[in-house]
Amino acid sequence: MTGTNQSSVSEFLLLGLSRQPQQQQLLFLLFLTMYLATVLGNLLIVLAISTDPRLHTPMYFFLSNLSFVDMCFSSTTVPKMLANHVLGTQAISFSGCLTQMYFVFLLVDMDNFLLAVMAYDRFVAICHPLHYTAKMTHQLYNAIPHFFCDVTPLLKLSCSDTQLNQLMILTEGALIMVTPFVCILASYIHITCAVLRVPSTRGRWNAFSTCGSHLAVVGLFYGTIIAVYFNPSSSRSAEKDTMATVLYTVVTPMLNPFIYSLRNRDLKGALRRVVSRRTFSV
């Protein structure tokens, strides 16, 4: 019986986005600023909706959940990267890597399904306004060239053939992504048909404008996901993968509260009341 030389991996090294010290300092400040903006922006959305009884409706319920998920999403990846920079280490344990990867996939899926439910909410509100309340009440319903443990760079570390793993991930990802995306598409097809029947141009514009924020978030979310996970590996570089991943793990959660509150008069009013209440209490 011949012996074989085997070794086990106990930790990985996260190489980050740059190895240049000057760039690392700049990236640290940039990601710290974006992370704080993400947490504060989404936290304000959650507080505004939870403390204002006028916003206790299905649309704002889903929005507050999306803000909470976005806050958790950024907290899964960015703090570890910032901590590694402060501590001067690039290591992440094997169990820590798997845990981070698990929560990234969990929160991406939650974002995915929340966007689909929000599209259905807009569909019911526009196409079936008289049944909206009845339908939407809760009574009826090694070295990783990356800055977090993403599955694509992790599979590249394997010494064995990973084609089957990649096929399974692509198939499962397609099923998870396609089902909500089809719901979103169907909702907006019905919305478009209903809006086009509105006689006045102003009425059509007002109806479409209620969906603008959601469409912007859907475009950002699905655009970056498709760019990262549904392109052939040979056609893109690790750097492009990393930058696309930064978009959906850091930039999109940061932009969501601004996108949703920018054109929403009720939400802006609730935010002003939250800020003024906190200011006077201090």
Where are the language model's segments positioned?
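Transmembrane helical core of 7TM receptor-like proteins
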Residues: 1-282
